[in-house]
Amino acid sequence: MQTTPPKSVKHVPTYCYNCVSGPDFMTVKVVDGVATEVEPNFAAAEIHPARGKVCVKAYGLVQKTYNPNRILSPMRRTNPKKGRNEDPGFVAISWDEALDLVAEKLKTTRAKGVLDESGVPRLAASFGHGGTPAMYMGTFPAFLSAWGPIDYSFGSGQGVKCVHSEHLYGEFWHRAFTVAADTTSACYVISLGANVESSGGPCAVTRHADARIRGYKRVQVEPHLSVTGACSAEWVPIRPKTDPAFMFALMHVLLIEHKQDEMDVPFLRDRTSSPYLVGPDGLYLRDATSRKPLVWDTATNKAVPFDTAGVAPALSGKFAISGAVSVDADDEVREMNDVEGVTAFTKLVEHIEKYSPEWAEKICDVPAANIRRIANEYLAAASIGATTVIDGVTLPLRPVAVILGKSVNNGWGAFECCWARTMLAVLVGALENPGGTLGTTVRLNRPHDNRHKSVLPGEDGFMAQKFNATDKANWAVKPTGRNMHKTLVPIVGNTAWSQALGPTQLAWMFQREQPAGSNMPQPTLPDVWFIYRTNPAISFWETQTLVKTIATFPFTVAFAYTVDETNYMADLLLPEATDLESVQMIRVGGTKFMEQFWDHKGVALRQQAVAAQGDTRDFTWITNELAKRTGLLEQYNEAINRGAAGVSPLKGANYDFSLDPKGEHAPEVVWDAVCRAATTVLSEGKETLDLSWFKEHGFYTVPMSRLEWYLSPTMEKQGLRYELPYQERLLRVGRELRNRLHENKMAWWDEQLSEYAALPEWHDVPGRWDAALVNAGAKVEDFPLWLLASKSMQYHAGGNVGIELMREVAQNIRGHSGVIMNAKTAARYGIADGDRIEVRSHIGATYGAAVLAQGIRPDTLVILGQFDHWAQPFAKDLDMPSLNTIAPMSLELTDATGSGADIVKVQVRKMEGHMEGAQA
């Protein structure tokens, strides 16, 4: 067959950042103006951790661009009634009409005051997966900055059901919004549910493959054999939600069955709170004058403040102390005369002694011999005393790490898990040292692009922390947002990301019903709600109830790609030009999420590879128009000049590419200025590159020292200690929060307050789910199985479920066609592979095909991704189940940080019919 040769073929460099495993570099092949292929960008092979490769999701972007189900013009709702069974009656309108509608609503809202009568913002916004929508929303963050207070309380699950507790405790302990292994140098990794071969993108897959070739060992501890488990040296099928017991037993082996000098004694003594003396009231013994914590000086045989010059602190022991004080909640000072002072390390050893492998075996269903062997392998691999040289600096080499996955590091039990994981690193000196357990980035602290700069001296020799106030004068008795993050969760702070990481389920739940004795203002709805790249009607819990709440919102504006289950309730759909059709610059490199540890840092351009389909518009163009029509143009431009577009300020000490605050600026003018400013800053004034340069080259980076991967050298340079093992500050803060709540007759958060402890204790974590069943009026014996959710590389963030190519590829990976179930358990229920089954919790049911496997515990079911769609084209026809449909939103199952977990007790039964190809 004769074909006409193309008139033009281009390869356009851009990036994919559709999930937190990005950014990945790629090129788009464009033939005669049509995108035909996505390819790796091998020009980035030397600077990108995945050598210029992208993951499977990026290959669906061509089909996403030309999806016949796309919304191609603004749409207005004509049916005033909202609900799943109400046809919205969307009709196409012009951009002028759409933008005027939004602008008038915003101006009316602003005229009433940006805060409503209860003191919370009238404008709310919800964005999806892990901050990644910001990589596609152009200058919209600058508009939000210009507006003022925004309520981000209404989450879509990406906070509280993500790796939530790790975010909060990780940043508190070692500036680690997320935590990863230093895979490039690690020899032994214990992974508790961290499914990095699915959720870590090509960067993690590449690095772990290289590590296996190098000979490292990964032990995967989880109830089912995930993709990561299948790629590991060993799979340990642990009982769901018993991970703290397993890790406590590992610590027992190290602390009780080995000698103290087999640990990293210098690290424990000099970089942690281990030598601090604890008094009989469980608080630090302090110098009566300076109030600094005391240590026992082995050189002078007396207690002295921890920072005394030339001090030689005792790591362990008990000592007679006189003339000290302790400081409790609300600055209550107690005199401590003739008391015993015990080092925090000795308190730890005594605390952990009861948690033997034999004790843990009965709880987590892992043989004691296996627990003991894994602990001993970990200690041997730690190579305590070894060093390595990085950029001329000699550092400890501790090639062991412990990493946690979703539902291990969030919800009840997560505090204990995060503490134990971090302590396992501390004991061998592997925290923030080469080969060990590392933090990736910061979001609750600033600056976001360099976690080292967030390390500043604070009280008691630790890093400065920015907790929400719990003292009587400053505690936020009146919530500043609908999820009450500032009122209930001190550790989350009050920076830009804090609200989205508060207990967002409370914002949804309290719209329906407040807890008994809440003694809080009646929750209000926002006047306007913006949503983008988020679908809480599918991605949160108890979704059928959530839909009813969404339907009550008075005015919802959705930046929309297709109709979905959330924007089905919207009043206005604004179609943005998507991934391959619009322009934006972002930061790349440094250290960022998952395993994105780079040896470079810089910026990358997402550019218009093809013309926008229909009447869709660049997000920056939409934002410009909103700013102009709402009278916020000057404030908006000033926000862009400050760097609110997400890269660099447009004016610095030696450069000025500022926009005229009073003028209107086309998207390409804005991004040209950003390109120039970013390259000037990165090159320290040596180069200034414009938008046209980036359209050709795609990215610009400069080398970065690998020393920036590791926080311990920064801690040492500033003479700071990690706030481990003893959690005295959290204990005091928790007591202070209890005082405030009880003064205001609020007892409904008491169970969460129980989590504030100096040394975490095991409590019956799985039993909390049984208790919740009983309290809901159900019988525990009726729901004998655990249902878990697991990540899928093909559907990592869930935003691409409407792309047929993803379905086609996913069918090659087991589990993407239904509910993974143990084959012997299935036989007991008379269920064969491919049978249609009902999975029911005490609040509802979800349906799908049985996918039988041996690599899953008999008491466990697993569903990949999040489905059960009923509005989104293509996805609604997949007949796929979802845990979210049947997992309750529950105050009872919310921990002290405000998080829950993707886990629910269920029953299962066979339905009529067989679903062909279910095992694919």
Mark where each language-model region is.
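Long, contiguous, secondary-structure-rich segments that constitute the structural scaffold
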Residues: 604-673, 803-820, 824-920
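N-terminal export/assembly segments and adjacent metallocofactor-ligating motifs
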Residues: 1-326, 367, 462-474, 736, ...
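Flexible loop/turn segments at secondary-structure boundaries
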Residues: 23, 45, 131-135, 160-163, ...
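N-terminal leader/propeptide and maturation segments of large enzyme subunits in energy/redox metabolism
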Residues: 77-97, 101-102, 110-115, 252, ...
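Thiamine diphosphate
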Residues: 2, 13, 114, 145, ...
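Flexible glycine/proline-rich, aromatic-decorated loop/lid segments
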Residues: 227, 565-603
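Glycine-rich phosphate/diphosphate-binding loops that line cofactor/substrate pockets in enzymes
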Residues: 95-122, 179-188, 351, 374-401, ...
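Extended redox/cofactor-interaction regions of prokaryotic respiratory oxidoreductases
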Residues: 138-209, 214-220, 245, 323-332, ...
